[in-house]
């Protein structure tokens, strides 16, 4: 899931992704936007 959160590193995406997927969240930063996935 790509969310509308700007990022320069995956660490910036982890908290917003955890809000969606909980403790099983994975986060990537792609093209300046956060991508969340379930692990």
Curated annotation (Swiss-Prot):
Signal sequence, start to end: none
Instruction: State which tissues express it.
Output: Expressed by the venom gland.
The record's Gene Ontology cellular component field reads:
extracellular region
As stated in the Swiss-Prot or TrEMBL entry, residues carrying the post-translational modification Isoleucine amide are 39
Question: What Pfam families does this protein map onto?
Answer: Toxin_2
Q: Which UniProt keywords apply?
A: Amidation, Disulfide bond, Ion channel impairing toxin, Neurotoxin, Potassium channel impairing toxin, Secreted, Toxin, Voltage-gated potassium channel impairing toxin
**Positions bearing the site annotation: Basic residue of the functional dyad:** 28
Beyond the main fields, what else does the record say?
Negative results: does not inhibit calcium-activated potassium channels (KCa3.1/KCNN4) of human T-lymphocytes. Does not inhibit voltage-gated Shaker potassium channels. Does not inhibit Kv2.1/KCNB1 potassium channels.
Per the entry's comment, what about the domains?
Has the structural arrangement of an alpha-helix connected to a beta-sheet by disulfide bonds (CSalpha/beta).
- UniProt similarity note: Belongs to the short scorpion toxin superfamily. Potassium channel inhibitor family. Alpha-KTx 02 subfamily.
Stated role: Blocks Kv1.3/KCNA3 voltage-gated potassium channels of human T-lymphocytes (Kd=0.98 nM).
Question: Under what name is this protein listed?
Answer: Potassium channel toxin alpha-KTx 2.11
């Amino acid at each position: 899931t790509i969310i509308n959160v700007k990022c320069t590193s995956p660490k910036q995406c982890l908290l917003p992704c955890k809000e969606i997927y909980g403790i099983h969240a994975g986060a990537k930063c792609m093209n300046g936007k956060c991508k969340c996935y379930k692990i």
